[in-house]
UniProtKB/Swiss-Prot annotation:
NCBIfam families named in the record: GTPase_YsxC
Record family assignment: Belongs to the TRAFAC class TrmE-Era-EngA-EngB-Septin-like GTPase superfamily. EngB GTPase family.
Organism per entry: Hahella chejuensis (strain KCTC 2396)
Protein name per its UniProtKB record: Probable GTP-binding protein EngB
Keywords: Cell cycle, Cell division, GTP-binding, Magnesium, Metal-binding, Nucleotide-binding, Septation
GO CC list: cytosol
Pfam family, one: MMR_HSR1
One GO biological process term: division septum assembly
Keyword NADP appears in the UniProt entry: no
Encoding gene, per UniProt annotation: engB
Domain EngB-type G: 30-206
Record-listed Mg(2+) binding positions: S45, T67
Named cofactor requirement(s): Mg(2+)
Amino acid sequence: MTQTTKRPVSYQSARFLMSAEQLQQCPPDVGVEVAFAGRSNAGKSSALNAITQNGKLAKTSKTPGRTQLINFFTLNSEGCRLVDLPGYGYAKVPKAMLEKWRSNLQRYLEHRLTLNALILVMDIRHPLSPFDCSMLDWCEARDLPTLVLLTKADKLKYGPAKTTLQEVKKELKQKWRFPVEAQLFSSVSKVGVEEAHAFMDRFFIPPDETTSDVETTEEPQA
């Protein structure tokens, strides 16, 4: 008798729930959240849209750093949410505002109990920036499972892209001691989308939720 995993969570079901500037404005701290973070212009919004198969879910902009609030998206399974964190890096805003964003981001990462995992987006052409490393340090301090998506992989040929992936994996292993892995990703070719789904499934789907012989699926919600 075969055992197959249910998928009660449909990532296509993601719908905007609310925005918050500060931790105390976030939804009640119950349920499960997987957050998306990344340097400004790394392709975070495009990655979130590709993963949910909804090109309009997270607003994309040619101006780096336009994501200024913590944006919450609800899924079709009660208490399950995706979270789009403010882009960090070189946003063209006053320094005081950048520090405010950084402080709010840090408080969310350190104190949000429902945060179960993080997807950290990096441009494959500029991985492991000082900002990325700071983010990984925060994740390590909390022992937060993290998936690094090397976005815009379609901008490189396959050979150089794989080489960069191996180099990033090596550096992650050498510098950090917590559950972190890396994956090539392209919102254009959809490389890495299934791997991102599998990573999130670990937190949204209880390991004992199996069914015999026939897998049960849900129709994606429009």
